[in-house]
């Protein structure tokens, strides 16, 4: 990922939140872009901001001393200033060199979270999204899972960047043409998956760490029957929390095992 920090303002509270979030969701590496350097005349101030960012990264177990830091100005680059255009190229080179290329999970059963749905006159309904794992070939059956009863359809076309393909694999952003499916029968938050490979659930157990106020989380405790939103791939669903017997409440900063009952079924895996 690219962490953007204003050279004029230095790390802000949301900078800490972004680093923490990156750590918690498993982002493997970060590259820093110090933006708006054209507004800073003092070289020592720039060095101070860079040191602050490196310290913050180290605080959350990123290798702060080793992370590439590129100083530039996005606005000046957009205005055609060659000096700052070079900095953007330098940034992208750092991304290529420092951030590991993700491995495509192509051998497992096909699964694609649905991001958007639209109709093509005369052709049918298209679901778009990024293939999370596996492969899909034209003519193969898939299940539409989550939010409603599971249904089955056939992928009659695969399109990427306005080109028709015979198949798609993990990492591809595609549109999948679905046979005999009405526009209202598929929606964001569902998944397309190889038949029998994943099932919808409304109830699950989870081990949870509750972010503290300093980490951008809660200010107050919560109790059983608390109803937060739970995020799954491309959607969020309300769930009712049940705390373990004998646990009256959970404070920010606590670890807890809880049972959650969702108000709609979602494709969930361990």
From Swiss-Prot:
Main location: cytoplasm
Keywords: Cytoplasm, Elongation factor, GTP-binding, Hydrolase, Nucleotide-binding, Protein biosynthesis
UniProt GO MF annotations: GTP binding; GTPase activity; translation elongation factor activity
Binding positions (GTP): 35-38
Keyword Cell division appears in the UniProt entry: no
Subcellular location: Cytoplasm
Superkingdom of the organism of origin: Bacteria
EC nos: 3.6.5.3
Catalysed reaction, written as an equation: GTP + H2O = GDP + phosphate + H(+)
Residues annotated as domain tr-type G: 1-103
Gene Ontology cellular-component terms listed: cytosol
Protein purpose: GTP hydrolase that promotes the GTP-dependent binding of aminoacyl-tRNA to the A-site of ribosomes during protein biosynthesis.
Classification via NCBIfam families: PRK00049.1, PRK12735.1, PRK12736.1
Subunit structure: Monomer.
Family: Belongs to the TRAFAC class translation factor GTPase superfamily. Classic translation factor GTPase family. EF-Tu/EF-1A subfamily.
Name of the protein in question: Elongation factor Tu
The organism of origin for this protein: Staphylococcus warneri
């Amino acid at each position: 990922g690219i962490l953007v920090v204003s050279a004029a303002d230095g790390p802000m509270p949301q900078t800490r939140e972004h680093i923490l979030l990156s750590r918690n969701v498993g982002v493997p590496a970060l590259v820093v872009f110090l933006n708006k350097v054209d507004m800073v005349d003092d070289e020592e101030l720039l060095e101070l901001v860079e040191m602050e960012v490196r310290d913050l990264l180290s605080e959350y177990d990123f290798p702060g001393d080793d992370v590439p830091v590129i100083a530039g100005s996005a606005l000046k680059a957009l205005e055609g200033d060659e000096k700052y255009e070079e900095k953007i190229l330098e940034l992208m080179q750092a991304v290529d060199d420092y951030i590991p290329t993700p491995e495509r999970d192509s051998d497992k059963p096909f699964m694609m979270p649905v991001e958007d749905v639209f109709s093509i006159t005369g052709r049918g309904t298209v679901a778009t999204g990024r293939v999370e794992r596996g492969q899909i070939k034209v003519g193969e059956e898939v299940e539409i899972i989550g939010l409603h009863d599971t249904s089955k359809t056939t992928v009659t076309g695969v399109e990427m960047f306005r080109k028709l393909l015979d198949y798609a694999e993990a990492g591809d952003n595609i549109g999948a043409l679905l046979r005999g499916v009405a526009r209202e029968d598929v929606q964001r938050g569902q998944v397309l998956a190889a038949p029998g490979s994943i099932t919808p659930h409304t109830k699950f157990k989870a081990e949870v760490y509750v972010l503290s106020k300093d980490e951008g989380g809660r200010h107050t405790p919560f109790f059983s029957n608390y109803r937060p939103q739970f995020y799954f791939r491309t959607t969020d669903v309300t769930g009712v929390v049940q705390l373990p017997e004998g646990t009256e409440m959970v404070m920010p900063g606590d670890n807890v095992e809880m049972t959650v009952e969702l108000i709609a079924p979602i494709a969930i895996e361990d």
